[in-house]
Design a protein with these regions (language model features):
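Bacterial N-terminal signal peptides that target proteins for export
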Residues: 1-9
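Bacterial N-terminal signal peptides
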Residues: 10-18
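Acidic, low-complexity, intrinsically disordered peripheral segments
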Residues: 22-27, 33-43, 47, 104, ...
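Small/polar, glycine/serine/threonine/aspartate-rich low-complexity segments that form flexible
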Residues: 46-50, 98-166, 301-313, 345, ...
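A glycine-/polar-enriched beta->alpha junction
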Residues: 61-70, 77-92, 125-158, 167-184, ...
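Amphipathic alpha-helical coiled-coil scaffold segments and their short linker/junction regions
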Residues: 62, 250, 254-255, 289-358, ...
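Amphipathic alpha-helical coiled-coil segments
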Residues: 71-86, 202-227, 236, 243, ...
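Periplasmic alpha-helical coiled-coil/stalk elements that build and connect Gram-negative outer-membrane
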Residues: 86, 196-319, 433, 478-479, ...
Length: 517
């Protein structure tokens, strides 16, 4: 075998083998990809990686990877397809058919035929039919025929016919009018708008939850830091008391009390560490960092040092106005009411009798050749008809459906009023919460400052022997609690603002988030 032939044969065999093993290779590639991802997860677990991250970064991660957002994002696209499906009712339909029919049989008459009657018929028809948004139905047909037989009495043999014809049916009562016939389109469009509001609500919930988890993590970082400082104060005090005990200034009871307090603070620090890790994991879950092979085990370092305090003057009436304008759940409910109005309209229309006016106009062309048939299809040979069709239902089922739709609307209106009451109460509650938390921050700031000043003074008194070990330990606890209360006040104030924005439907606007339509 020559070299070129061997090359061609080898390539052919390789091609066949590749085709047969394609499915197996694809499965193997998927398996390797899973193994690589598993390896990356395990490798990341062995690394001490630090991820510097801010609030804006967390929101960006959430918008990109949060599973609830990814699932809900598909809903408007599904509703867009429903709109196209509804509009398809008004798209024209082309139809065509071809029939060849041959018939040979014994003749029962001598008139025009011999002993055998033979016919051959070819039909070729085409047409366009459809419906306008007014309910008018149209049907435009082009009918052609070629007929040949062995009958001697047939004047044209073969003969061709060409018959253009248009038929129009116009409903007068039932199924008449633009509003009734486009009801499905309008409902589908409203359903899409409702799904967009639902998507907006999902994004708002995810963003608000992300911000809250971020502030919780910030709180537990500060909590861990405060507990660390508190433990250090106890250790420093223990060293001082050991030196004093050696000099006989304090008793063994003072040492025991200091050691007991230090043990309790070590326990509190461990608890703070556990809470910190849990808060870190919660933040990773909402941002979906937990599914990142490289970042799932990274230590999060916040670029924002401490929570901000920006005192805001909140206007209750303006907040309520915003809620009724921007809240997705309220807007979605109003869209649903519009759909119910449309369903009542269509149910009421179904009560009317069917009265359809029909009319058709056609031309008859006949000739020995097809061209002759085309030329003879003139107004001299017309085919027309007019008429009407009447159907009067007993009305039992249609009347029941109409009554049902009215009751559903009344029920929905009551539901809307209840929702409006809940919105008012919720917004008022959130406005109050912001005001209370703002005052809490002011009070806790003063308390922290006073406790810090008091502890500094008590330290001097303790150094002078005027304060007992028990008292100085108590002052340390009070200082740590005051510091923690202030941080908690800041966190709670920021969370109150987050909840207020969400209750007004302003979460996306306040965070400069614009959703794609």
């Amino acid at each position: 075998m020559k070299a070129p032939q061997r090359i061609i044969l080898g390539a052919f065999i390789l091609l066949i083998y590749s085709g047969l093993s394609f499915a197996a290779d694809k499965k193997a590639d998927e398996e390797r990809a899973r193994e690589i991802e598993k390896y990356l997860f395990m490798a990341a677990g062995a690394q001490d990686r630090v991820l510097e991250i801010g609030l804006a970064d967390c929101i960006a991660y959430t918008l990109k990877s949060n599973s609830e957002i990814l699932i809900k994002r598909i809903e408007p696209k599904l509703k867009e397809d429903d709109i196209r499906i509804a509009k398809a009712d008004f798209e024209p339909v082309f139809d065509a058919d071809y029939t060849l029919h041959s018939n040979t049989k014994g003749s029962t008459t001598t008139l025009g035929y011999g002993s055998i009657a033979s016919t051959r018929d070819i039909d070729l028809n085409a047409g366009i039919s459809g419906k306008f948004i007014t309910g008018t139905e149209y049907d435009i047909d082009f009918l052609t025929e070629r007929y040949k037989s062995n009958a001697s009495t047939q004047r044209l043999n073969p003969y061709h016919t060409f018959e253009p014809k248009m038929t129009v049916t116009q409903p007068v009562f039932k199924d008449s009018g633009i509003l009734v016939n486009t009801a499905d389109i309008t409902i589908a469009q409203n359903n899409k708008a409702e799904s967009q509001e639902g998507f907006k609500q999902t994004v708002m919930d995810a963003v608000a939850k992300t911000k809250i988890m971020y502030y919780y993590y910030m709180y537990y970082l500060e909590n861990h830091s405060i507990n660390t400082s508190s433990l250090k104060r106890a250790k420093d005090l223990l060293e001082i008391n050991k030196a004093r005990y050696a000099k006989g200034i304090v008793s063994s009871v003072d040492l025991l009390e200091t050691e007991s307090s230090m043990a309790q603070r070590e326990k509190a620090l461990l608890s703070a560490e556990a809470s910190l890790k849990k808060a870190e994991d919660d933040l990773k879950v909402i941002t979906n960092l937990v599914n990142d092979p490289e970042l799932w085990n990274a230590k999060l370092k916040l670029v924002d040092d401490k929570p901000e305090f920006n005192a805001e003057k909140i206007d209750l009436l303006e907040s309520m106005k915003n809620a009724f304008q921007y809240r997705p759940d309220y807007n979605s409910y109003k869209i649903d009411l519009r759909n119910r109005d449309i369903k009542i309209l269509t149910a009421k229309n179904a009560l009317f009798p069917t009265v359809d006016l029909t009319g058709s106009l056609g031309l008859n062309g006949l000739g020995k050749e097809y061209q002759d048939a085309l030329e003879n299809a003139t107004t001299d040979y017309k085919d027309w008809s007019v008429g009407f069709k009447v159907e009067i239902p007993w009305g039992g089922g249609e009347r029941a459906e109409f009554d049902q739709r009215k009751l559903e609307l009344a029920q929905a209106i009551m539901g809307l009023k209840r929702l409006e009451q809940n919105v008012i109460l919720e917004v008022r509650d959130k406005v109050r919460a912001v005001d209370i938390q703002m005052r809490q921050v002011g009070a806790s700031r003063i308390a922290r400052e006073k406790e810090a000043q008091n502890y500094a003074a008590q330290e001097e008194r303790y150094a002078a022997g005027q304060v007992s070990t028990h008292d100085i330990l108590d002052y340390q606890e009070r200082l740590a609690q005051a510091e923690l209360d202030y941080i908690k006040g800041l966190i709670d104030y920021n969370i109150a603002l987050i909840d207020l924005d969400k209750s007004q439907g302003l979460t996306l606007a306040k965070n400069n988030i614009i959703l794609e339509e």
